[in-house]
Amino acid sequence: PGKEQAADTARRAAQLLLMQEAVVLMRDDLKESCYVEGVQYLPLEECLSRTDVILTIGGDGTILHEANFTLQYQKPILGINIGRCGFLATCEVDEMEEKLAALVRGEYMLDSRMLLYVRLLGEDGWEGHALNDVVVTKGRLQQAIDFSIYCDDILVELSLIHI
């Protein structure tokens, strides 16, 4: 999906929510590409702290990115799918009017997902969060990877995998 399709979908979603008398907040960096009269354009952090639900427009990759980015705000995410894969992004564009109206009326169920904390130890260490699963790879080199998996500081699995 292109950026123009995402912008068109964002404008349409904002219009539908405003017609339902919802308060619509949008990141101020989207004002030029997604302007809709009646939307409040604010810094991202203010949008995230004030909103009840975060809307993402894209595919599952967009939701995975936003889930990690918005973790500290503990807000539900509704994904409007304009991508190829819509397992997590459960609202299709042609369902937007119906689903956004139901959202404003409070007629929805939350689907909780497992969020994993991931920490890579070593010289190039990294840490972050993942939604549902983590893929560990060494790249293209044929080599063994030795790793340990912990849950609540208890060793769950110790593995040596040849790639």
Regions found by a protein language model. Give the residues of each.
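Short glycine-rich anion-binding loops that position phosphate/pyrophosphate groups of nucleotides
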Residues: G2-K3, D60-T62, C85
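Conserved small/polar residues in nucleotide/adenosyl-binding loops
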Residues: I161-I163
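Redox-cofactor binding/interface segments in oxidoreductases and associated redox assembly factors
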Residues: T56
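Short glycine/serine/threonine-rich phosphate/pyrophosphate-binding segments
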Residues: A6-A7, G61-A67
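ATP/NTP phosphate-donor binding region
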Residues: P1-V53, D94-M109, L120-G128
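Short, acidic/small-residue loops that bind anionic groups at enzyme active sites
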Residues: Y73-C91
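Catalytic core of DAGKc-family lipid kinases
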Residues: C85-S159
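Short glycine-/acidic-enriched loop or helix-start segments at secondary-structure transitions
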Residues: V36, H65-N68, A89, D146
